[in-house]
Amino acid sequence: MESTSAFNLQMRPDNVAVVTIDVPGEKMNTLKAEFARDVRAIVKTLRENRDLAGVVFISAKPDNFIAGADINMIAHCQSAQEAEALASQGQQIMAEIRALPVHVVAAIHGACLGGGLELALACHSRICTDDVKTLLGLPEVQLGLLPGSGGTQRLPRLVGVSTALEMILAGKQLRPRQALKAGLVDDVVPQSILLEAAAELAKKRRPAPRRLPVRERLLAGPIGRALLFRMVTQKTHQKTHGNYPAAQRIIDVVRTGLEQGSASGYQAEARAFGELAMTPESAALRGLFFATTELKKETGSEAAPRALHSVGVLGGGLMGGGIAYVTATKARLPVRIKDISEKGINHALKYSWDLLEKKVRRRHLRASERDAQMALISASTDYRGFHQRDIVVEAVFEDLTLKQNMVAEIEAHTAPHTIFASNTSSLPIGDIAAGATRPEQVIGLHYFSPVDKMPLVEVIPHAGTSAETIATTVQLAKKQGKTPIVVADCAGFYVNRILAPYINEAMRCLMEGESIEKIDEALVKRGFPVGPIQLLDEVGIDVGTKIMPVLERAYGPRFSAPGDAVAAILNDDRKGRKNGRGFYLYPAKGRKSKKQVDPAVYGLIGVKPGGKLSGEEIAERCVMMMLNEAARCLDEGVVRSARDGDIGAVFGIGFPPFLGGPFRYMDTLGAAAMATTLTRLATRYGDRFTPCDRLLRMAQTGQTFWLAGNLQAEMTV
């Protein structure tokens, strides 16, 4: 037996070599440059073994094959040439594995992503387990990169160019049965027989190249290929607006390999990898990755969290149903819902059932797994079953007296250790806790809608919240699959506070005569997932604007809504998508049509569209209001660090990820340039654009929000 730091070679009695991957001291297997020499030594040993019957690559980790390459390697590269050399080295190692004279099989259980899938693609065959943890994909585009160890060349030849482009451009991850159907794996087996199945396959003759489906063969021809690449390029630009350079480079590199041969393709792949690694977009996206990874390790306070055994939810509406769903399906904790009516209970239970049933229909979940997860959710119209709940999450109407009554009832019907977490979006947590007998166990836990999709939660302690309560609440959020940031107990907290001036400015542009389409398109081109006016329609115009008066009372006229536009819209019973009446037209259920603005809106607000601003000017006004408010929030300690502020904006409101978040973007622009731009806008449009004190101080001293030269955010002081 030969042993290395991460790769171990062992010969079986049947002369099948098993290469076990197990990076010491790490939960996840990741590929590092320093492993290259060890892997090459193993490959050399295998090549020289004349009795070798086959080779199996398998992981010793319980839930991952290889999660990808270590991204820190890129951070250490000082030039595109260094990053290109890194990719070339990876390509060469994969080529050496591929060139082994026997059948090489990848035995995959758990995450097989990025460089992990590229290693599996270098093998002649792949077998994976049928476990829910098993996922296969090339997610490098999400870091502003492309697969650099042969993935752009091997995947199209294995599954077809159309399927490969879909996977690589979207960073799409396939489940076992999807991978089998696509031809990415050759078999799906239970984990208990994975090694034996792979070893038996390895002893067989190497397979002939897979025959692609008819559609993929047609697209591989000159005419089909030209049409495909034209359509993919057009669709990609419509989606990215040129903000993500990796997308176009992926298309170009895949095409190069298909039209000029794999040698040219590999060369183009390595070169593109090196150049993309040096782009500001990749640096920003990798910065976000490191920031979220770092945040996952934190407990939110210096105290240790209490163990969680069960959870309660008050309210069976959209939010309550969503909170119960993620508690049962992600945290795998028993959850009890209380609502005042049977209708509310039925709604909450149906919410979870419908989502789980959809997963079953799509073969993402077995019916037995659906039933097991639904069994974790129970409900009643009284407090039976609440006595030993560790946390009760309140999701009732935004009414202070009602929420205070909920605190009193929970304290009366639960254990002394039970935490009361309010899902308020606007009410001060200190006010909710004002009459509590255990105020140290009252905290805010602000989810975003829809709960099953939005990754962020804000954890809001008031002045009297205990450190243990904070840590335990953060722990629950993580178990629910959320990214929690701890924010201060003040009006709007963080996310809604920076979102409000952004939406207000969009409404001001509307009142000045700019069309709804032009405003939304300007911000989508800037990189937001939807425009600010469409966002109002999506979240509900009544809900989205309810917080505006609260913010204006707390922070003054810079939060005042423009004119009576919102009142006129609401008075016409326009609440957005949820009631089919908003700024946009919504077709009857079941009918699809292109998104269109409702022209009647202009008459309601007394505006004739015909503004003179460019899209860039509209985007600048809206984004600058958000950035200025974000800087204020950091200065006031609303967020603990620039890191938390960036994560909150990207995951909470869809701030363009390629910019890295508002604080990294302000660093890119520079504090002095920010102050100059805001002063110019203040001169033209009013005092609401006046640069905040923090930016003015930083402009004088040359400070940045993120410490220069690394990915660490400056903490507030």
Swiss-Prot record:
GO MF terms on file?
3-hydroxybutyryl-CoA epimerase activity; enoyl-CoA hydratase activity; long-chain-3-hydroxyacyl-CoA dehydrogenase activity; NAD+ binding
InterPro entries in UniProt: 3-OHacyl-CoA_DH_CS (IPR006180), 3-OHacyl-CoA_DH_NAD-bd (IPR006176), 3HC_DH_C (IPR006108), 6-PGluconate_DH-like_C_sf (IPR008927), ClpP/crotonase-like_dom_sf (IPR029045), Enoyl-CoA_hydra/iso (IPR001753), FA_oxidation_alpha_subunit (IPR050136), FadJ (IPR012802)
UniProt keyword Isomerase present? yes
NAD as a keyword? Answer: yes
Where does the UniProt entry say this protein principally localizes?
Answer: cytoplasm
**Site positions per UniProt: Important for catalytic activity:** 118, 140
Q: Which UniProt keywords apply?
A: Cytoplasm, Fatty acid metabolism, Isomerase, Lipid degradation, Lipid metabolism, Lyase, Multifunctional enzyme, NAD, Oxidoreductase
Q: What is its EC number?
A: 4.2.1.17, 5.1.2.3, 1.1.1.35
Q: Give the pathway annotation.
A: Lipid metabolism; fatty acid beta-oxidation
User: Gene3D superfamilies per the record?
Assistant: 1.10.1040.50, 2-enoyl-CoA Hydratase, Chain A, domain 1, NAD(P)-binding Rossmann-like Domain
- Record's subcellular location: Cytoplasm
Q: Which GO terms describe its cellular component?
A: cytoplasm
Q: Name one GO biological process term.
A: fatty acid beta-oxidation
Span list, region 3-hydroxyacyl-CoA dehydrogenase? 306-717
Per the record, what are the reactions this protein catalyses? a (3S)-3-hydroxyacyl-CoA = a (2E)-enoyl-CoA + H2O; a 4-saturated-(3S)-3-hydroxyacyl-CoA = a (3E)-enoyl-CoA + H2O; a (3S)-3-hydroxyacyl-CoA + NAD(+) = a 3-oxoacyl-CoA + NADH + H(+); (3S)-3-hydroxybutanoyl-CoA = (3R)-3-hydroxybutanoyl-CoA
Where is region (Enoyl-CoA hydratase) located?
A: 1-190
Record-linked PROSITE patterns: 3HCDH (PS00067)
Question: Which PANTHER family does the record match to this protein?
Answer: TRIFUNCTIONAL ENZYME SUBUNIT ALPHA, TRIFUNCTIONAL ENZYME SUBUNIT ALPHA, MITOCHONDRIAL
UniProt similarity note: In the N-terminal section; belongs to the enoyl-CoA hydratase/isomerase family. In the central section; belongs to the 3-hydroxyacyl-CoA dehydrogenase family.
Q: How does it assemble?
A: Heterotetramer of two alpha chains (FadJ) and two beta chains (FadI).
Function (record text): Catalyzes the formation of a hydroxyacyl-CoA by addition of water on enoyl-CoA. Also exhibits 3-hydroxyacyl-CoA epimerase and 3-hydroxyacyl-CoA dehydrogenase activities.
Q: What is the recorded name of this protein?
A: Fatty acid oxidation complex subunit alpha
Species in which this protein is naturally found = Cronobacter sakazakii (strain ATCC BAA-894)
Encoded by which gene?
A: fadJ
